[in-house]
């Protein structure tokens, strides 16, 4: 098998022959130890215990290394739960890759006897941001600049929450046409009980800071495989300081959304969530309070390396008459880039197509940063 083929996550030589379920594994290990003892090899068995632990995502993550999805906690009450890995590593010739850890368990509920099933995944993608503007905005803005995301610690360019994150890699990993390479991580999953009850149940990453550690570990392995790693590996050493606020119901059409003066929406059946509010990043999400459908996504990005993911898609003309900088207002997304307090700032909008929403947000963010309004007077609503 070539290194570009999809391959299972690496295992220890003898461990790879063991079942992936806990009960089957323990039974076979016990039988092997007894057999070895009976043949005079008990000392060898004792000297080499414990068996090598499974590793996942190009060797970045080790079984039982902290977060629940890598330990027995992932299986709940199921003694036969399984955890499997598959991966394709990036290379110098093909600097894209992916890895996935999948967890499955089925057991009978001790409370009501219903059959319970969980299927969970943690997926990592390594590669450049898309060329097309809409695809790039959908990936980065919709996926990783929501109101529940916060900046990565230690000045790392990216965002994170308890279900995943995005990290922009150093310029040495850029494509020949200048697009940054990013590593993304997402946890997903479902929980089913009985014949009719199903809910979202993402794999447990251990919180936002642990998710940042997992993301950076995968990024370091990916960069090494692709031949673009920096001299020193990226590290997470600080806590997360900028935690997002809780979602809050919007009770009136006159209420300011996400604490932004003058940003009013035309419906009351929504809730807003404010994420980071720093000089480098500001995020806001508005969703339906019953169905969670996105109603409005807003972000300001001034961190240079994170903002680089939008290079080349901000256009050459103002977004509209009287607006500063350059940008476009499309059917699904809007983007504006303008100088603000001595450096470029990028203002983004998703879900809504109303330029007044972006105007209110951009002008409020610009005022907070100490620079001139982005949109002309009267454009906000």
Task: Locate predicted features.
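Terminal targeting segments of Actinobacterial cell-envelope proteins
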Residues: 1-24
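Hydrophobic membrane-insertion alpha-helices, especially the h-region
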Residues: 18-44
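Short, solvent-exposed recognition patches
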Residues: 76-160, 262-344, 349-353
């Amino acid at each position: 098998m070539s290194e570009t083929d999809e391959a299972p996550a690496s295992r220890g030589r003898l461990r790879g022959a063991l079942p992936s379920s806990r009960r089957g594994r323990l039974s076979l290990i016990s039988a092997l130890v007894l057999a070895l003892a009976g043949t005079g090899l008990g000392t060898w068995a004792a000297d080499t215990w414990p068996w090598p632990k499974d590793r996942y995502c190009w060797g970045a993550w080790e079984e039982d290394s902290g977060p629940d999805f890598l330990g027995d906690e992932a299986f709940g009450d199921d003694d036969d739960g399984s955890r499997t890995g598959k991966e394709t590593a990036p290379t110098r010739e093909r600097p894209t890759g992916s890895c996935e850890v999948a967890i499955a368990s089925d057991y009978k509920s001790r409370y009501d006897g219903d059959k319970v099933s969980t299927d969970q995944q943690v997926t990592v993608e390594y590669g450049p941001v898309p060329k097309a503007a809409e695809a790039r905005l959908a990936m980065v803005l919709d996926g990783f600049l929501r109101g529940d995301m916060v900046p990565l610690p230690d000045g790392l360019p990216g965002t994170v929450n308890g279900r995943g994150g995005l990290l922009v890699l150093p310029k040495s990993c850029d494509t020949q046409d200048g697009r940054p390479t990013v590593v993304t991580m997402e946890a997903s999953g479902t929980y089913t009980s009985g014949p009719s009850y199903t809910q979202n149940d993402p794999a447990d990453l251990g919180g936002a800071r642990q998710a940042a550690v997992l993301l950076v570990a995968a990024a370091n392995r990916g960069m090494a495989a692709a031949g673009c790693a920096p001299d020193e590996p990226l590290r997470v050493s600080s806590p997360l300081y900028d935690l997002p606020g809780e979602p809050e119901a919007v009770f009136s059409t006159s209420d300011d959304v996400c604490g932004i003066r003058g940003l009013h929406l035309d419906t009351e059946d929504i809730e807003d969530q404010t994420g980071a509010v720093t000089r480098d990043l500001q995020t806001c999400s508005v969703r339906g309070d019953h169905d969670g459908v996105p109603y409005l996504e807003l972000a300001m990005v001034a961190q240079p390396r994170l903002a680089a993911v939008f290079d080349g898609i901000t256009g050459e003309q103002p977004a509209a008459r009287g607006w500063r900088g350059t940008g476009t207002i499309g059917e699904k997304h809007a983007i504006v880039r303008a100088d603000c307090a001595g450096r470029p700032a990028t203002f983004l909008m998703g879900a809504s197509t109303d330029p007044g929403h972006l105007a209110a947000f951009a002008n409020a963010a610009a005022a907070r940063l100490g620079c001139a309004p982005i949109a002309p007077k009267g454009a906000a609503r």
